[in-house]
């Protein structure tokens, strides 16, 4: 059925289209933290996230990364390939920050000699726990070969993103990716890429991401607008 709500999320709603293999993603004017425990309506945030994510996905597509992104169709909407989402959050860390610093008792801002890839099990009831490769296999999420692919593709995407953000004066601290299986059973990059799931610091160490909301550091949309303008100029 066309225009039927398929999924209602914290930051995005997903609808069916005339093509059973294509979905319409609507970005919402809402910020959340602590797995949705804190919610706040923020006017204009959805449009900013959509435009930023669209720009980044377009660049990734051109760079040869296979993604779900098709096109942006309005300020807060885009068309995507329909995928079966893998219930993993794949996090890559270039610099210590956030939960990593808290978990291991290290200060924020320490550059990691080798970027670290982490897995988190996407399960709201369990608060998305940190898991390792063996847990991933035990849960039957993906196999060894697919784990290796997810890690390798995440590291490749990291090198691309780091380079692009460096060109506009931003340091990519860490980011979260989600992948899914397309209609042919191929793993492709899905979800979004925006300051909601990319931790970005400027040259002075100022937060240019969702931490502005998490830590009450200022106006979130003002910060996201700066990131968007920088990406447009790239």
Curated annotation (Swiss-Prot):
InterPro entries xref list: SAICAR_synt/ADE2_N (IPR028923), SAICAR_synt_PurC (IPR033934), SAICAR_synth (IPR001636), SAICAR_synthetase (IPR050089), SAICAR_synthetase_CS (IPR018236)
Keywords noted in UniProt: ATP-binding, Ligase, Nucleotide-binding, Purine biosynthesis
Gene Ontology biological process terms, A to Z: 'de novo' IMP biosynthetic process; cobalamin biosynthetic process
Enzyme class: ligase
Molecular-function GO terms, alphabetical: ATP binding; phosphoribosylaminoimidazolesuccinocarboxamide synthase activity
Ligase keyword on record: yes
Disulfide bond residue pairs: none
Catalytic activity: 5-amino-1-(5-phospho-D-ribosyl)imidazole-4-carboxylate + L-aspartate + ATP = (2S)-2-[5-amino-1-(5-phospho-beta-D-ribosyl)imidazole-4-carboxamido]succinate + ADP + phosphate + 2 H(+)
Assigned EC number: 6.3.2.6
SUPFAM superfamilies: SAICAR synthase-like
Listed pathway(s): Purine metabolism; IMP biosynthesis via de novo pathway; 5-amino-1-(5-phospho-D-ribosyl)imidazole-4-carboxamide from 5-amino-1-(5-phospho-D-ribosyl)imidazole-4-carboxylate: step 1/2
Stored Gene3D superfamilies: ATP-grasp fold, B domain (3.30.470.20), Phosphorylase Kinase, domain 1 (3.30.200.20)
Record family assignment: Belongs to the SAICAR synthetase family.
Protein name (Swiss-Prot/TrEMBL): Phosphoribosylaminoimidazole-succinocarboxamide synthase
Classification of source organism: Bacteria, Bacillati, Bacillota, Bacilli, Lactobacillales
Gene that this sequence comes from: purC
